A protein has these predicted regions:
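Short intrinsically disordered, low-complexity coil segments enriched in acidic
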Residues: 1-2, 400
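Bacterial N-terminal signal peptides that target proteins for export
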Residues: 3-15
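A general structural signal for short secondary-structure junctions and capping/turn motifs
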Residues: 4, 93-95, 155-158, 267-268, ...
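Secreted, disulfide-rich extracellular signaling modules
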Residues: 14, 18-22, 396-399
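C-terminal motif of bacterial Sec signal peptides marking the signal peptidase cleavage site
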Residues: 24-27
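Flexible, low-complexity junctional segments that flank or bridge functional domains
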Residues: 29-311, 495-514
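C-terminal "post-core" interaction segments
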Residues: 272, 276-277, 281-292, 298-299, ...
Length: 514
């Protein structure tokens, strides 16, 4: 919800609010304003803005204690409150996403070497060079252009031209066929036919469907074995190894625009109709279509209604926040029908901006062609990346429905930021402007939400699979909870991550929940 008139008013306050800070620019009666302003103007603007809109403005040091000759990041850090856990940020203004290969990864040391690594692909952006190459979540990169991954060669994974990658898969080697973690027969369907997001993941998901068909008998047998021969199973855990499967050509880096709706899927078990949504950002749309992603949510809600969905798994493991209206829309889709029009959240600003304090409701008008699913329970997959708007959704749904969290603790960002831009400087400042409470006045999740069922997916590498696969460990856990048949495989030893890399996502404008 961009407050543009307010932004302009704040910029006009600069000459007055900056006067106190300018005393250091006069020496022995000599006016040195013109000499120093090009070096200090940007920091002075940031200082005046923060003293007006920052939620914790009272904690900003006195002007005489500040250095206005610093770069923007250093200056912002020097004025932030101790309550601000890197929620407020400043960054350059970019019209296009930074070029990248479009995948994230985590490094693991090779067992036989102290200096070489394998890279586990943890995320593949849609319509990216990585997806074009056929990379999938759960793939292992073993070589880059024929070279081992080392501290010197790792940079080739993040930037550059065309690369050749040696790919492997993590498998458990043992005498008996490996167990599949899912129980029962599961059929999966993608979302709306012709949907670009679904098509982009079809290769991996078709393989998963085949696994469903071919693995069920083995799975049932294994379950019986588990019930009758637990001790024998413990003795035959097997060894995890990475098996080479071939080379792929990775196209050169290019600008990659992240899609908010990553994967939509329907999973049908006997007696259960389950919807799965991997939602990676609370973003309404694109520059070309401002409601593109919201409309995808609305269309998916209609599909869920048509299929008679009675359980919903919302995957927010990669969702680091976004726009407040998107939170309201998704909540409108999920909550019990009789809760529509009820209070949803309360925004509390600082005392200088108290006129902006306001209530948000579960506004059915936001549905605009979407439908309410009248759910009483929601299963949400979380991680340490889950933050901001994603946490707001969790907090604000809790008064109205049962929220079951699966995965890891969330980040603990309980405030909202707003983007401010001064045309004179190519920088965007995003200070914390308000605190976000649910309808019961609760906002105490600064340490994050702890999961009801804690699962560290890196401890189950055989099941570190593309999002939407019913065998992927976190989704599989959710399915097990829903069907009452949860049974986790034993964690594998010796899988300690060394380093993780994530591509830089675009910064959104407007009121962002962090």
């Amino acid at each position: 919800m961009t407050q543009r008139p307010m932004k302009k008013r704040k910029l006009l306050l600069f000459p007055l609010l900056g006067l106190l800070a300018l005393t250091s620019l006069f020496s022995c009666g000599e006016d040195r304003w013109k000499e120093y302003y090009p070096l200090t103007g940007r920091d002075l603007w940031m200082d005046s803005l923060m003293r007006e809109v920052y939620l914790w403005y009272e904690d900003i040091p006195a002007s005489k204690e500040l250095n206005y000759f610093q770069d923007p990041e250093a200056f912002l850090k020097s004025i932030l409150s101790s309550k601000d856990k890197n929620f407020s940020t400043v960054d350059t203004i970019t019209d296009a996403p930074l070029p990248s290969y479009g995948f994230d990864y985590t490094l693991y040391k090779v067992a036989t070497s102290d200096t070489t690594y394998n890279a586990l692909v943890s995320y593949v952006a849609l319509n990216s060079p990585a997806e074009d190459a056929g990379l999938e979540r759960g793939d292992w990169i073993m070589l880059i252009d024929g070279d081992s991954i080392t501290k010197k060669t790792e940079e080739r994974l993040t930037d550059g031209g065309t690369r050749k990658l040696r790919i492997g898969k993590y498998v458990i080697v043992k005498n008996e066929e490996s167990q599949e973690p899912a129980e029962g027969d599961a059929d999966t369907e993608t979302g709306e036919s012709g949907d670009t997001d679904n098509d982009n993941n079809n290769n991996g998901n078709n393989n998963n469907d085949n696994d469903n068909d071919n693995g069920n008998n083995n799975n049932d047998n294994d379950n019986n074995d588990n019930n009758n021969n637990d001790e024998e199973e413990e003795e035959d855990e097997g060894i995890g190894v990475i098996q080479e499967i071939g080379d792929v050509t990775l196209p050169a880096v290019r600008s990659v625009t992240e899609k908010a709706v990553y994967e939509k899927r329907f999973i049908l078990y006997p007696g259960y109709k389950i919807a799965y949504l991997a939602y990676n950002s609370f973003t309404a749309g694109t520059a070309e279509n401002s409601e593109e992603y919201n409309d995808e949510l609305r269309a998916f809600s209609r599909q869920c209604m048509q299929k008679g969905i009675d359980n919903f798994v919302l995957d927010l493991r990669y969702n680091a926040g976004g726009e407040m209206e998107c939170v309201q829309l998704l909540a409108d889709i999920l909550v019990p029908a009789d809760k529509l029009e009820s209070p949803f959240a309360f925004l509390q600003y600082n005392d200088k901006q108290s006129a902006k304090n306001r209530d948000l409701i579960l506004d059915s008008q936001l549905l605009q062609g979407g439908v309410n699913l009248n759910l009483s329970k929601i299963y949400i997959i979380t991680s340490g990346t889950t933050a901001g708007a994603a946490e707001m959704l969790i907090n604000c749904l809790k008064p109205y429905m049962t929220v079951i969290l699966i995965g890891q603790s969330t980040k603990g960002e309980y405030v909202a930021t707003e983007t401010f831009i001064n045309p004179k400087y190519p920088w965007a400042v995003r200070p914390v402007v308000c605190e976000v409470f649910n309808s019961e006045g609760e906002a105490d999740y600064s340490t994050g939400f702890k999961p009801d069922i804690s699962v560290n997916e890196s401890s189950y590498l055989p099941y570190y699979l593309p999002l939407g696969s019913p065998y992927e460990i976190l989704l599989n856990t959710a399915l097990g909870v829903i069907t009452g048949a949860i049974e986790l495989p034993e964690p594998q030893a010796g899988t300690t991550a060394v380093k993780s890399f994530a591509t830089k996502k675009n910064v959104r404008k407007g009121l962002i929940v962090k």
